[in-house]
Amino acid sequence: MSGHGPAQPMTARRSGPLKGRAEIPGDKSISHRALILGAMAVGETQITGLLEGQDVLDTAKAMRAFGAEVIQHGPGAWSVHGVGVGGFAEPAEVIDCGNSGTGVRLVMGAMATSPLTATFTGDASLRKRPMGRVTDPLALFGTRAYGRKGGRLPMTLVGAADPVPVRYTVPMPSAQVKSAVLLAGLNAPGQTVVIEREATRDHSERMLRGFGAELSVETGPEGQIITLTGQPELRPQTVAVPRDPSSAAFPVCAALIVEGSEILVPGVSRNPTRDGLYVTLLEMGADIAFENEREEGGEPVADLRVRASALKGVEVPPERAPSMIDEYPILSVVAAFAEGSTIMRGVKELRVKESDRIDAMARGLEACGVRIEEDEDTLIVHGMGRVPGGATCATHLDHRIAMSFLVLGMAAEAPVTVDDGSPIATSFPAFTDLMTGLGADLAAG
């Protein structure tokens, strides 16, 4: 069963100007999906730029357990020899997805319509997260789920031997739920329809089409209607994974708040369903230039040139939340250094992420001398243009909380310590080396 080693505290101190080129790892969302779709294609899929954080490595291990041949050839270079839609073998062991909500929910979807049984678990954080939001729609296909109280891991799924196509309206904006239903629909006959009231990141739709699935997206009075025709033969692909905009957010935001900084962040995904943070930063007055805009692997990408900026507080509308759900922690840090209040509405989904991210950020920012207001669905940061710092902040085993407070420490008046930096490895193993390479004062302890 997934455990967690001893805590590894880290401290960030006020840093000189950040300068240079920040090479960001591959996009986490696309990396998970490339491995899973590669495993469901017939033949060999080649992947470059794969994120080699623990979350994605756990998904690679899961695909091996279901019978795909997954091989690493070099840094970021992998191949997946797929078994075809409906070709999964029953795993002999428990599937441990570590810290990854995306990994476990997508893999559950991928196996849900095959006549086999699999048991899933994860680390202490993942075992607290609700899985009913995925197992409820999977039950419509005929999948049975047996988990702990509240639909939590460990959980055993018994795949549907005779799946039926499904029409499902996603009750909350969740790309993970949408993607799990679409992946399950691959091995169901007829057409599976997913209706989203609010659009979420569309990597699954782009990549399913790329692998040869018949998929259409229309907008109607109910929202966005995604129709997938089941039982295709997926064709292997060559996937170049763009750089992760959620990981890029950390050096980008650090450069905005550390005086005198100028950095270049090449090859970052500009997918409009993931762009909410950058839209918001520009509204705050951020000096970010998007250079060399191009397309790679069906995704728009650009090089980001970022300079330190005087920022002002803004109101972030709730409809922007799905396109920046992972970026609110780092945005709340930037907001603390802005002049005036930043109001973030429609953020209740943050309460069921790797931690209750609203509570974690509010408590840590308050400890660093920032005035905060919050309710179930709103976070307000009253920026003063400066942050006293000088606190130890709890990360709750959450990689994004850990990185956000370390960025805060780079511009705060007194050092900021996080109680455990080890979760950073789940999404951004090179974070410390990359930031110190740019000039950040960041160290263990």
From Swiss-Prot:
It catalyses: 3-phosphoshikimate + phosphoenolpyruvate = 5-O-(1-carboxyvinyl)-3-phosphoshikimate + phosphate. GO terms for cellular component: cytoplasm. It holds the Pfam family EPSP_synthase. Phosphoenolpyruvate binds at residues 28, 101, 129, 176, 357, 400. Residues 1-25 are annotated as: Disordered. It is found in: Cytoplasm. 3-phosphoshikimate binds at residues 28-29, 33, 174, 176, 326, 353. The active site is at residue 326. Monomer. This is 3-phosphoshikimate 1-carboxyvinyltransferase. The lineage of its organism: Bacteria, Pseudomonadati, Pseudomonadota, Alphaproteobacteria, Rhodobacterales. The gene is aroA.
